[in-house]
Amino acid sequence: DGKKQGEKDAASAYADVAADPGEKPTIIVVMSESYADLSVVGDFSTNIDVAPYFHSLKENAIHGYALSSVFGAKTPNSEWEFMTGNSMAFLPSGSVVYQQYISKTPTSIVSNLKNDGYTCVAMHPYYETGWSRNAVYPDLGFDETHFIDDFDQTKLLREYITDRELYEKIIDRYESRAANEDLFIMSISMQNHGGYTEKYDNFDEKVRLLGLNYPDVNQYLSLVHESDSALEYLISYFQNVEDPVEIVFFGDHQPSLSSSFYPNLNGKGLSGLTEDELEDLYTIPFFIWTNYESTEVELPITSINYLSTLALERAGIELPAYNQFLADMMETIPAINSRGYYSKSAGGFLHIEEATGEEADWIRNYNILQYNNMFDKKEKSEVFFPYLK
């Protein structure tokens, strides 16, 4: 029947993504604060390459660009989309999920991996009360949480703990794992947090725009450059370990910079934009790298809510029912966020209410499933949303 054929088509398309490491890999996620590639908005020139190492990583990774649902702020919404596979598309504008909608143990990559025997660790080198994470992380099912007091607070760039210090902590936790411990680490960095207007004695800014004078943009790009060096340190370490390791890296949202900078990129600024131009501001780079699989897969457009499904597939882990639904949905709806979705039939971005035909069917079913997962306490589908064991 048609559904079975649809599943076969989806399975064949994602054969490139799936890999079999032979044993359960360590899975490390880095959601990098304000990490973005501003060239998606428009062209500009700098004195040096902003992220040379990131650009070199593509050869043995799934890589590309993903839609975020937020611009310049509200990090936890990206965190939530990644972990749960849910989308801000179906929640009221301006929502912050962690402060409004988290229930006890929602189905997520945390509960799925925990049910699969993983130890689940959350790391965030900032205050535990930020966005109520100290309450939310235990609800999500994390076994361990590490906040600012667990990090070396002398390792600062400007006034935030460095990516390098976060990565050293990740490596320490990996090296101290028990003999048969399967490890999942979800980390959220702080180094590149806005704003970018103050000058700091502890930060030698290496990147500068050519032909344009925007000190905040220079500082931001210099921070991304520092992130790039730290990333090389992290990947170089895990390239040389024998056990299988997967690293998922993505930005949570683009930075908030001088509004007068944007006309230099897109010719218009931040207003009067087409839907496609607006979505450029919600686009962040990502990769999923492993030390056991060398195939390169380029995904020119996806969205943060799909990344955990891609990560589970690449890790060789059998997809839970909800993630299988998302893997199938990607074939028709390659990207979706709070603004709209990428329509293959239209060849561009549309608002959700503009969807027709098969695209509308997928979006409607996704909305129904997400509502069931988040709000339907009595009739929650245990097929799609098994409880934490």
Range-by-range predicted roles:
Residues D1-A15:
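N-terminal hydrophobic targeting segments that direct proteins to the cell envelope
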Residues S12-K24, V29-S32, D37-K389:
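Solvent-exposed soluble domains appended to multi-pass membrane proteins
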